[in-house]
Regions:
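Cys/His-rich zinc-coordinating "finger/knuckle" motifs
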Residues: 34
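Subtilisin-like peptidase catalytic core
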Residues: 99-108, 131
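Serine-esterase "nucleophile elbow" of acetyl-processing enzymes
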Residues: 37-101, 113-122
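Conserved Rossmann-like nucleotide-binding pocket used by diverse enzymes
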Residues: 23, 96, 163
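Alpha-helical cap/lid subdomain in secreted, periplasmic
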Residues: 6, 91, 110-245
Length: 245
């Protein structure tokens, strides 16, 4: 019998909250998550920090509504907050936000090459944050794995490093589904030598102080906490630059 660590129990509990909230929000609907209302969640705007001196680092943040900044004002998204923290740490980083609300891994796969080809240059790193809508719609883990694999294969072909911000399915979706889904991200991270943050909403989901009213998306304070955890990992995942001659 597999021994479930306290950390894994905590992540399962958090994932359960996410799915329960998402299913309530999506009850009797099959359409994509709607566009945010004009009045977004109140909260502190991510401060705009000028790019520091040093070599430019281009990062693509490719994901769903958690990257897109659903329900937040412009400049309050997770990629915005990570960019700010990187610049505060002395990294001349620019993050292109390619988050689209409602995207499943299949929808992301369809637009992935287009997103890469329309960047100003080859990115130094690609963050991929998909899977939440796959869980909410209970898409088969094999399909999710195939879509994620295709995107990572594309990055491998282009010699672009990846970082995965993972998603987890809760136990109430069934032991087989949960097992097959939750192993996708660590498996792929190991196979493609990608940096892995196992569950993007860890430490945020379930805390009403950090979540919007829908209980699915973080508010600005939740974004700040996520970025605080992710930014050092993103910095470490950036490839080492060759010394200038």
């Amino acid at each position: 019998m597999e021994i479930i660590t306290l950390q894994r129990k905590r992540l399962y509990a958090a994932a359960t909250v996410l799915v329960q909230a998402g299913l309530l929000a999506a009850c009797d609907r099959t359409a994509e998550i709607p566009t945010p209302a004009p009045t977004a969640t109140a909260g502190p705007t991510v401060p705009q920090v000028a790019a520091p001196k040093g070599p430019s680092r281009l990062i693509l943040a490719f994901g769903d509504s958690l990257y897109a900044g659903y329900g937040l004002d412009r400049g309050q998204s997770i990629p915005d907050a990570i960019q700010t923290r990187l610049r505060q740490a002395g990294v001349n980083a620019t993050i292109v936000n390619a988050g689209v609300s409602g995207d499943t891994s299949a929808a992301g796969r369809q637009r992935f090459v287009f997103a890469l080809d329309n960047l100003p240059r080859k990115p130094d790193l690609v963050l991929i944050g998909l899977g939440g809508n796959d869980v909410l719609r209970q898409i088969g883990p094999a399909e999710t794995r195939a879509n994620m694999t295709a995107m990572l294969d594309e990055l491998k072909t282009r010699n672009i490093p990846a970082m995965l911000t993972g998603m987890m399915a809760p136990p109430n979706l069934g032991a087989d589904y949960t097992r097959d889904f939750n192993v996708i991200w660590p498996d792929l991270a190991s196979r493609y030598h990608a940096t892995l943050y196992p569950f993007i909403l860890d430490g945020v989901i379930g805390d009403t102080r950090l979540m919007q009213a829908d209980r699915v998306h973080p508010n600005p304070d939740g974004v700040a906490k996520i970025a605080e955890r992710l930014a050092p990992m993103v910095k470490a995942a950036l490839p080492t630059l060759a010394p200038s001659s």
